[in-house]
């Protein structure tokens, strides 16, 4: 991980140097982000923060606010409308995201009250959705495979270690509520605890409303509906790069 950070720093530095050398540094909007968390178990291709919390670094050439770390909630669907506002471009009516361009001039500008994320499949079918607020997260799985979906985890020594220490038998929480203020690592599912039932209902309503507003639906589960071009593993497949015919939905 630290080597990846070092490589990013070195190569991003080359881009900054080139912009300065060509005289475009002070008229260029600069942004760096990533698509998901690290490719380890319980990170990439999960809805834990370790999977959906990604880097986002932006520089507006003429900001009032600069060089600060902002802790508000932002979704990547907010990036396109933000770029439009910063560059003075008319936004498309179909954008679902909310521009956070005003943050560059006002640190106290309101950010997203909640953000949403989803999984359908990486190499195998695993429909899941989540809603995250500042203090809570609700994760819902909509499939019927209750074990950890190993084929959606990239192969690595870390994955091998987890498989040798019980991950093959471990079941995931199909419905989970996390108190992020007190449990930032999402280790304790409080969905059954009495004092969290009001929070659960609130988060459930937010997620259901979002799904209705966006026309969200899980991908078809029946095997005859898969596109022929898709490579779709069986849920119990361990290796995402398996070449065994029985590991695939034909």
Where are these regions (language model features)?
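A structural signal for well-ordered alpha-helical segments within the folded catalytic domains
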Residues: 6-13, 74-81, 95-98, 133, ...
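Long, internal low-complexity/basic segments
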Residues: 53, 166-175, 180-185, 190-250
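Structured segments of extracytoplasmic/periplasmic soluble domains
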Residues: 18, 22, 85-86, 103, ...
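Short, solvent-exposed turn/loop segments enriched in Gly/Ser/Thr/Pro and often Arg
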Residues: 32-40, 44-46, 96, 119, ...
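Histidine-centered active-site microenvironments of extracellular/periplasmic hydrolases
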Residues: 18-75, 96, 235-243
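A long, amphipathic alpha-helix that forms part
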Residues: 1-28, 63, 86
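Active-site rim elements
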Residues: 1-5, 63-73, 86-91, 117-118, ...
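C-terminal cap/loop subdomain of S1 sulfatases and analogous C-terminal strand-loop tails that border
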Residues: 38-40, 80, 87-176, 214, ...
